Amino acid sequence: MRRFWRWLPRWVRRLVKAILALLLGILLSAAFLYWYANPSITRINGVVYGTRGGKDLTIDVLTPKRPNGVGVAVMVSGGWKSGGPGSLDTWFVAPLLRGGYTVFAVCHISQPQATVMDAITDVNRGIRFIRHHAADYGIDPDRIGVTGGSAGGHLSLMLATRGGPGLADAADPIDRESSAVQAVAIFFPVTDLLNLGTSTENPGDGGPPISFVKGFGPDALDMPKWKVIGRASSPIYHVNPDMPPILIHHGDADTLTPLEQSTWFQERAKEQGVDVTIRVHPGGEHGWLTMLWDIWKFARWFDTHLKDVPPAG
């Protein structure tokens, strides 16, 4: 074998070595990615936080091996359709789990079985539930972050803009809790349902998104009523000075929820004296291959605005 190897031309030997080195590098990289995407956790699926139309509203709780005492809620929603217990892939939130964050996968009833407005109400209850049981999950009730993409980003911003105190005299103790969140990191949200701009979902008359009309209920077909619904369900109309730190990653080639949806929100926030950080992905459409790397950046954002913030009191 050695004689054969020596007999080969030098350029062939170099080529073989280069190929072997490349294959080894690919193998090691794949092994690392597999290890990184599968952290050691304790997972509880299907914790019921409420009901809607006779159906359970559920949260999955993913606790890392070394929790840092801070929770991040993931809005499991795309097109305002949600999954059920176990639907959130661990690999997608691996950077958060490896950062020590306890992850709460908040699911809602998918439209059109429930309306988008119902989903907004229900994810608010989800945050109240998490806060009420903070001690059970080993997290600080005053340091809860939220993340999601697309419809999940929209729901996250509704929490950022409208989440707030519960009802002090509510019979259900969960409803007495606040639904406010303390930091937000999201992907490509829709922020203005009354102005869909250059979106492929724009009907051209100020009406609801073309593919999601049923998701807003029968009143969405009545323009005067839709204007009330659309305004109430759009984060941009609820921007206020008390919003938490917000990070948005958005692609400049997104035709479903164009980048302008985020920049408009940023401009409105600036008018209120609030900074919203946008990271533009050149050529990025409604999702891209390196989103796991962006989740790692989200974890660093939460480090700055949640983990490294001293607990209240």
Briefly describe each language-model feature range.
Residues 160, 195-238, 244:
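Mobile cap/lid helix-loop segments that gate and shape the active-site cleft of serine hydrolases
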Residues 69-79:
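Short beta-strand element of the alpha/beta-hydrolase
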Residues 30-66:
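N-terminal cap/lid segment of alpha/beta-hydrolase-fold proteins
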Residues 248-250, 254:
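Short beta-strand/loop motif that positions the catalytic acidic residue
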Residues 84-86, 92, 104-141, 288-293:
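Catalytic nucleophile-loop/oxyanion-hole region of alpha/beta-hydrolase
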Residues 292-313:
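Catalytic active-site module of serine/aspartate enzymes centered on a nucleophile-bearing elbow/loop
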Residues 128-200:
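Primarily recognizes the serine-hydrolase "nucleophile elbow" in alpha/beta-hydrolase
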Residues 255-264:
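Conserved alpha/beta-hydrolase "acid-adjacent" motif
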